[in-house]
């Protein structure tokens, strides 16, 4: 009779009972989140606020697949194991994230027509993760099922293997923002910030980023007061540069080493290593530049049109292969790529019916050129 763990007639799917009985994949995780803040208003218009957030993550996984799932017969026992091709590992991990933010905001209106809102602040973030894994993909005794780690080499089996991984990330920023409007007609805003990230080389960890915008609310002008069918007419323009450090590698700027084939000296096999990634102290922030021009129009309290023209340019951090004529293989992370998007976006929304029964329709159209 066919073994119950063998593949079925179509040679693609095993008996689900064997998967349930002979496969173990236990997972456990816990996540905690805590936060606190303190806020005070010492004088009118001034708000001082500081906040702290702390998050922890812990996880554990036990995975085991017996030889039965490979169609092997069970003929061994704890003292004389002879199972082949078993697969198991135990994975444990822990990480935490700490975030602190402090801001001072001042909001004031003077002479009834001038409104000013300013803010300065500081952010700090620290993230740490640790992971350890123990593997056994050998001919040894079922390690997790028997909880027997004393058997290390049975029937030519490989030794137990293990690995660990640790990473940390530090970020801080100082920033300032100002928003001014005159009688709700003219709005001016600007911001500047200095960010630092441990993901970049020592020479480029700090980056300066800024933005500015202007808006003219035409319907607030005196010469527009008698045009009652026009709800809103506004012109907008903005330009800014933002930074991105989420590049998928906490240590992209550091040299890395990988293992290669063994080299035999006499009767001994010696493992060899080679540089697979090279240091780049000039690796810096991905910078995103964006310029927008737009206008908003609303009429008859029923129809609204929003039009935006934009141009966005993004720098990209990417690995660049080292030419083979250097005599070495590998890659180095560089600010080597760039993407440009420009186009137009139009949105039209209408509410032809209002009251007990209402009907709202929104249409959007866009065109984008990418290179």
Where are these regions (language model features)?
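Extracellular/periplasmic, surface-exposed regions of secreted and cell-surface proteins
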Residues: 2-65, 76-371
């Amino acid at each position: 009779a066919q073994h119950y763990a063998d593949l079925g007639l179509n040679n693609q799917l095993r008996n689900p009972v064997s998967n349930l009985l002979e496969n173990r994949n236990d997972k456990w995780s816990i996540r905690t989140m805590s936060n606190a803040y303190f806020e005070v208003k010492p004088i009118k218009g001034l708000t001082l606020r500081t906040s702290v957030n702390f998050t922890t993550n812990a996880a554990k996984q036990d995975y085991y697949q017996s030889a039965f799932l490979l169609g092997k017969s069970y003929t061994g026992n704890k003292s004389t194991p002879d199972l082949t091709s078993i697969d198991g590992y135990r994975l444990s991990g822990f990480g935490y994230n700490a975030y602190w933010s402090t801001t001072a905001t001042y909001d004031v209106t003077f002479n009834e027509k001038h409104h000013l809102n300013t803010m300065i602040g500081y952010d700090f973030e620290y993230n740490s993760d640790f992971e350890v894994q123990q593997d056994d993909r050998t001919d040894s005794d079922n390690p997790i099922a028997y909880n027997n780690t004393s058997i290390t080499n049975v029937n030519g089996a490989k030794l137990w293997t293990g690995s660990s991984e640790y990473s940390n990330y530090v970020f801080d920023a100082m920033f300032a923002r100002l928003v001014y409007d005159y009688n709700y007609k003219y709005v001016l805003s600007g911001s500047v910030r200095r960010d630092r990230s441990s993901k970049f080389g020592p020479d480029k960890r700090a980056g300066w980023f800024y933005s500015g915008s202007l808006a003219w609310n035409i319907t607030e002008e005196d010469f527009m007061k008698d045009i009652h069918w026009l709800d809103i007419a506004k012109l907008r323009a903005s330009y800014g540069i933002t930074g991105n450090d989420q590049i998928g590698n906490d240590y992209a700027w550091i040299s890395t080493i990988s293992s290669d084939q063994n080299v035999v000296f006499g009767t001994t096999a010696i493992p060899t290593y080679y540089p697979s990634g090279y240091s780049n102290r000039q690796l810096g922030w991905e910078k995103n530049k964006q310029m927008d021009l737009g206008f908003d129009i609303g009429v008859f309290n029923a129809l609204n049109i929003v039009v935006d023209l934009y141009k966005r340019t993004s720098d990209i951090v990417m690995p660049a292969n080292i030419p083979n004529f250097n005599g070495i293989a590998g890659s180095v992370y560089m600010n080597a790529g760039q993407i440009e998007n420009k186009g137009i976006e139009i949105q039209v929304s209408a509410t032809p019916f209002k009251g007990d029964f209402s009907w709202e329709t929104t249409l959007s159209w866009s065109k984008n050129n990418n290179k």
